[in-house]
Amino acid sequence: MKIKFKKNDEVIVIAGSHKGKTGRIVKVDINNNTAIVKDINIVTKHVKPGQGNDGSIKKMEAPIHVSNLSILVKKATKTSPAQFSKIGYKFDKDNKKVRILRKTKKEI
């Protein structure tokens, strides 16, 4: 499965316990088809004490599968919900492959 998301894309979670939340992609893992989204899917990680450092409890973002994410077109307002779209590809005049929003046909 090809991952069409890139780092710093603004995405919305479309499925799961964090459905409807928006954020920016921090990291994309192409091997596991997952992405880490800033301030979404926060988990606590217990770090064992070792030589030279103390044990601690850290909060960090856990990865989300890319099938549960969609690119954000327009943020939600009081009167309208957030709009999101799938990502497609097309070739421009110079024969370069560019990413487009499938709903609006605009380049990203």
From Swiss-Prot:
Identify one Gene Ontology CC term for this UniProt entry: ribonucleoprotein complex
Keywords noted in UniProt: Ribonucleoprotein, Ribosomal protein, RNA-binding, rRNA-binding
What's a BP term from Gene Ontology annotated to this protein? translation
Q: Name one GO molecular function term.
A: structural constituent of ribosome
Task: Return the SUPFAM superfamilies for the record.
Answer: Translation proteins SH3-like domain
Q: Which HAMAP family match?
A: Ribosomal_uL24_B
- Organism placement in taxonomy: Bacteria, Bacillati, Mycoplasmatota, Mycoplasmoidales, Metamycoplasmataceae
The text of the family note is:
Belongs to the universal ribosomal protein uL24 family.
Concerning Gene3D superfamilies, the annotation shows: 2.30.30.30
Q: What does this protein do?
A: One of two assembly initiator proteins, it binds directly to the 5'-end of the 23S rRNA, where it nucleates assembly of the 50S subunit. One of the proteins that surrounds the polypeptide exit tunnel on the outside of the subunit.
What protein name applies here? Answer: Large ribosomal subunit protein uL24
What CDD domains does this protein's entry cite? KOW_RPL26
Record flagged with keyword Magnesium: no
Quote the subunit structure annotation: Part of the 50S ribosomal subunit.
Q: Which organism is it from?
A: Mycoplasmopsis agalactiae (strain NCTC 10123 / CIP 59.7 / PG2)
